[in-house]
């Protein structure tokens, strides 16, 4: 596909149309990395998520569900809720907290990206287990924040890939893709594995996702009250601060480029 304009219906109505100069505009770059496709439309202000992206998805994972919806919220509120465990006990007192911990995470920073680990209480079974071939499968939830708008989450029985597309300061379009877990030997998932993945996704949809959405929508509604000029984050929420620092850094770089005097001849 070279993007050239090949055909125009009723082209006699456009006698002076130069097809060679009216094709598609090429994008700057297309990168396939960690099972994700990154399309850079214009000259980038920096490497962004590609600066240090870990391996995330494998070829043997099967997509079994997808969803697209819009919410009247700012995308950052949803992102922030996935980057800390401070909210687990008050937000999920019956769904998640009985199986997890109160305000306990392991946070890793990877360039502008981050990975947040939410351990289940059953991880304590590994305390005295042999270190050889130790696996965290079904022992933790891992949220990989792909700077700035995406996340890849490994849950107990499935993966969730989420993309946010901001449409306004108070409206966001979300795309969600659910996949099976990787198979250790690289084979195809069985019907039993697929059934467990679907059951896990349904449980999350009926419980945690609804509880998170309620809190986020309440925060969004409260912003309009004017009672607070800003929100404060504690030391437990370092991944949120990391996201905002990198947003500020990249926006400052973009602003500098947009307001720099153009160079003659370029």
What kind of region is each of these model predictions?
Residues 1-40:
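Rieske [2Fe-2S] iron-sulfur-binding domain
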Residues 28-266:
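C-terminal catalytic domain of Rieske-type non-heme iron oxygenases
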């Amino acid at each position: 596909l070279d993007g050239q304009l090949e055909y125009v219906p009723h082209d006699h109505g456009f006698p002076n149309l130069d097809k060679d100069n009216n094709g598609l505009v090429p994008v700057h770059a297309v990168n396939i990395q960690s099972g994700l496709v990154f399309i850079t439309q214009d000259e980038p202000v920096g490497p962004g998520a590609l600066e240090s992206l870990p391996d995330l998805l494998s070829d043997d994972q099967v997509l079994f569900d997808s969803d697209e919806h819009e919410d009247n919220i700012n995308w950052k509120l949803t992102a922030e809720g996935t980057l800390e465990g401070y909210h687990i006990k008050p937000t999920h007192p019956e769904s998640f907290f009985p199986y997890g911990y109160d305000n306990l995470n392991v946070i890793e920073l990877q360039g502008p990206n981050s990975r947040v680990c939410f351990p289940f209480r059953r991880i304590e079974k590994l305390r005295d287990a042999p270190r050889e071939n130790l696996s965290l499968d079904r022992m933790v939830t891992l949220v990989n924040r792909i700077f700035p708008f995406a996340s890849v989450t490994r849950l107990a029985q499935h993966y969730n890939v989420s993309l946010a597309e901001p449409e306004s300061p108070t409206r966001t379009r979300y795309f969600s893709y659910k996949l099976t877990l990787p198979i250790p030997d690289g084979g195809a998932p069985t019907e039993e594995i697929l059934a467990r993945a679907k059951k896990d996704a349904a449980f999350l949809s009926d419980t945690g996702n609804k509880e998170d959405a309620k809190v986020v929508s309440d925060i969004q509604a409260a912003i309009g009250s004017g009672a607070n000029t800003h929100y404060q984050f504690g030391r437990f929420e370092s991944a949120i601060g990391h996201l905002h620092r990198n947003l500020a850094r990249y926006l400052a770089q973009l602003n500098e480029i947009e307001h720099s005097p153009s160079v003659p001849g370029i």
